[in-house]
């Protein structure tokens, strides 16, 4: 090793800026982004039994229910628990959509969801960090 050799210069890779979230996005897009963020923080619970336990413990911050749930008793139970414990409730049209948002699917190499399993009920116990999508969801819930 001679003194003529220069130390290699390490250049950090460019950091990709997160995609800007438009202020005028619709509720379903905002809910999808909110659930994705909450899932990354481990704050999403799926299934009727686990959701009912969290609602009764008053840990649930938001409950998302599929409108096309094939068990009317599930819908009645979740709505009653939310009303009784004053938990915010949102509904989505499809259980398959909710299952995809909850992570009950396989993601192929192109980033598309496949083998999606339906999800009738989902509870968010931790939203993670505050985002624009979360504020849109909160505004919608407050206006109900």
From Swiss-Prot:
Keywords: Acetylation, Ribonucleoprotein, Ribosomal protein. One of its GO terms (molecular function) is structural constituent of ribosome. Coiled coil: none annotated. PANTHER family: 40S RIBOSOMAL PROTEIN S12. PROSITE patterns: RIBOSOMAL_S12E. Signal peptide: none annotated. The modification N-acetylserine is found at residue 2. GO terms for biological process: translation. One of its GO terms (cellular component) is cytosolic small ribosomal subunit. This is Small ribosomal subunit protein eS12z. It comes from the Eukaryota. Belongs to the eukaryotic ribosomal protein eS12 family. Pfam families: Ribosomal_L7Ae.
